[in-house]
C-alpha cells in the first residue's frame, strides 16, 4: 500500500500560519512525524498565491528533506509550479496530480517521461468526476494513452 502523508498542506490553518510566519520547526516536525508513522511519500502543497508558490514549495521541500529521506509528493493546482519544484527534490517522487481536466497532464507527462517520477491520476475531466464506472474507465484509458505518448 502507498501511504501519502497529507499534513504539509497550506490549506490546513496551522500549516498556512507556519508558511506565513516562516515557522520552519513546524514544517520539519510535521514531516518527521509523518515519516516516522510510515508515510511512503510526503505531500507538500503550499496553497499560496501563484507568484510565490514555487519559492514557497522550495522552502518547504528543503525543510522536509532536512529531516527525512521520504520522497516528496509535489502538490499544486499549477502544472508549472509542479514542474518547477521537481529539481528541488533530492530523489524522484510523485506529482499530485494529473487528470484529463485542463492541460496539466500535457505539461507534466513530457517532463516526467523517462524518469523515475510517478504521478497520482484522478479520474476526472473537464466535466468533473463522472458518476458511472464506464465513464471513469474511459478517462482512465485516456490518461494511460497520454502516458504512452
Name each model-derived stretch.
Residues 1-23, 116-130:
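N-terminal small/glycine-rich loop or linker at the start of catalytic domains
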Residues 19-22, 26, 52-59, 131-139:
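Alpha-helix N-cap and loop-to-helix initiation/capping positions
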Residues 30, 56-64, 81, 104-108, ...:
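A general structural detector for well-ordered alpha-helical segments in enzyme core domains, enriched
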Residues 34, 85:
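Conserved, mostly hydrophobic/aromatic
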Residues 35-70:
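Glycine-rich, proline-tolerant flexible connector loops at the mouths of alpha/beta enzymes
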Residues 38, 87-94, 113-119:
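Glycine-enriched alpha-helix->loop->beta-strand junction motifs that scaffold or abut catalytic
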Residues 43-49, 70-78, 93-103:
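Catalytic beta/alpha-barrel core
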Residues 101-149:
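Conserved anion-binding
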Amino acid at each position: 500500500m502507498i501511504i501519502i502523508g497529507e499534513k504539509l498542506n497550506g490549506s490546513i490553518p496551522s500549516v498556512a500560519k507556519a508558511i506565513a510566519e516562516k515557522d520552519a520547526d513546524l514544517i520539519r516536525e510535521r514531516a518527521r512525524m509523518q515519516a516516522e508513522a510510515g508515510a511512503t511519500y510526503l505531500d507538500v502543497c503550499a496553497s499560496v498565491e501563484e507568484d510565490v508558490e514555487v519559492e514557497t514549495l522550495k522552502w518547504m521541500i528543503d525543510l522536509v528533506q532536512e529531516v527525512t529521506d521520504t520522497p516528496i509528493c509535489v502538490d499544486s493546482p499549477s502544472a508549472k509550479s509542479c514542474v518547477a519544484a521537481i529539481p528541488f527534490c533530492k530523489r524522484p517522487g510523485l506529482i499530485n496530480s494529473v487528470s484529463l481536466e485542463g492541460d496539466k497532464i500535457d505539461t507534466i507527462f513530457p517532463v516526467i517521461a523517462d524518469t523515475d517520477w510517478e504521478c497520482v491520476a484522478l479520474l476526472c475531466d473537464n466535466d468533473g468526476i463522472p458518476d458511472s464506472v464506464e465513464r471513469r474507465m474511459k478517462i482512465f484509458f485516456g490518461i494511460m494513452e497520454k502516458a504512452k505518448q
